Design a protein with these regions (language model features):
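Short internal beta-strands
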Residues: 1-2, 19-20, 98-104
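Phosphate-binding loop/pocket of nucleotide- and phosphate-handling active sites
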Residues: 150-161
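Small/polar-residue-rich loop-to-helix segments that shape phosphate-bearing ligand pockets
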Residues: 2-70, 110-133
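Active-site/ligand-binding loops adjacent to catalytic centers
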Residues: 94-150
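A short acidic Gly-Thr/Ser loop motif
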Residues: 78-83, 139, 160-161
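Structural motif
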Residues: 43-45, 76-78, 156-158
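A short acidic, amphipathic alpha-helical/loop segment
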Residues: 6, 31, 87-91, 145-148
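Glycine-rich phosphate/pyrophosphate-binding loop at beta-loop-alpha junctions
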Residues: 54-118
Length: 161
């Protein structure tokens, strides 16, 4: 089986990749927990969803806003675990945030947040064409809905790739 380009990039940067048979997230999580018990490694929570990580991502959002000179009217991103959208909400005051749920169900609520569910499952790829690199099962789905549903032209799209 050919490795995903992101996996190859992780290996290039020194990551040790242990592949397991794919399946439900609970099965993959069990493999990860067993590996950590066996090796003493530390397992990150799904989406690295810690307050420390949210603060780091939020700080990056503030840097982007500073570079833009103002908060955009709309910020769009994909939602997997919810870490990114939670971080954006922490770092902004006025922007309307649009999160496109592409995988796990996101249950967070905020007055400035609108969550749109992508109509196809995580494993189904978006066929939308963007003029920048984007993951077709993740960010590209959010960009597709951003282009279709944005309410203004003052939009920031956060592409994780």
């Amino acid at each position: 089986k050919e490795m995903h380009p992101n996996t190859l990039k992780c290996i290039e940067y020194g990551a040790k990749v242990v592949e397991v048979p794919y399946g439900y997230l609970t099965v993959v999580e069990k493999h990860a927990k067993d590996y950590c018990l066996l090796t003493g490694a530390k397992k990150l929570v799904f989406g690295a969803k810690t307050m420390e990580n949210k603060i780091l991502i939020g700080n990056r959002m503030r840097q982007v806003i500073q570079q833009l000179g103002k908060e955009p009217e709309e910020i769009w991103c994909a939602i997997g675990s919810g870490t990114l959208v939670d971080s954006i909400l922490l770092a902004t005051e006025t922007a309307k945030i649009y999160g496109v749920q592409v995988g796990a169900e996101y249950t967070g609520k905020h007055e400035r947040l609108t969550v749109l569910k992508y109509p196809k499952s995580f494993d189904k790829l978006s066929k939308f064409v963007a003029d920048f690199p984007s993951m077709p099962n993740y960010d590209l789905k959010a960009f597709e809905l951003c282009i279709k549903h944005k309410q203004s032209n003052d939009v920031l799209f956060w592409n994780v790739l």
